[in-house]
Amino acid sequence: MKKNRWQPTILAFAFWLPASTFASNDLYGPLRSYAQSPMQVVSHTNHLRSGFSLPSEYIEAYGSATIASVWAHTDEYALDYYHNQLEIGAKWQVSSQWQWELNYRWVFAADNHLDGLTESFHDLFGIGQNGRDKVDKNRFYISMPQYDVLEDGFEGQTIANNLSTYVQYQILQNERHGLSLGGSLYYNKVAHGTFKGSNFEQGVQLNYSYLYGAHAFYSMFGMTFRSDDRALLDLPYRHNTAAMAGGDR
């Protein structure tokens, strides 16, 4: 008999709302988060997962909302905009060794009014603004003269629109240790607007977790493979990238 649960996550505030009835062992794993840097948010990025499986035939549904303020300013480029992410998905523990996941993620440009909050945070802790206070607030602006890129006023447009699937095989699992290997397929297609385009990517990752008392340690090493060497307005991007992550609960 399949058992279902819903796992909402609001990543913008690092706030997790679990159902307490499933708090035993490692049913939740690490807080789910997706990289929000300009290049990573529009491509496949491996993220931290539990090395343990769910109980057989469990189905876990999840959803998240993330808001981000992008600011990067050098002599070569300037990025100043907001992006927002909505994500839904579900995992199914098909058997004791196999898990399958389906995920949809939408990233779009919209005014989330973070500029003022960010400047206040920098002032509070004595962090320099790096020019943020010299330009208008709430802009949507990307300039990279080296690559003939100049985009302004793209508020309301889709930045990424992707569907991905993930299959995981349980290599080892006992009371303390969990080791699993997973592979991902990722397809992104933006039909129109400034960020129009499509890309197909693949990923593989090794997940290891260790339980000790009420705590858990999580780690991940992964690789992403791309047929295209461009991302985000056709900017150069590596065909293959590696990622490592660790966490404690």
Residue ranges: model-predicted function:
Residues A23-T194, N199-S219, M223-R226, A242, ...:
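Transmembrane beta-barrel domains of Gram-negative outer membranes and organellar outer membranes
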Residues K2-I10:
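Bacterial N-terminal signal peptides that target proteins for export
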Residues I10-P18:
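Bacterial N-terminal signal peptides
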Residues L232-G246:
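A beta-strand-loop signature enriched in Asp, Gly, Thr, and Trp
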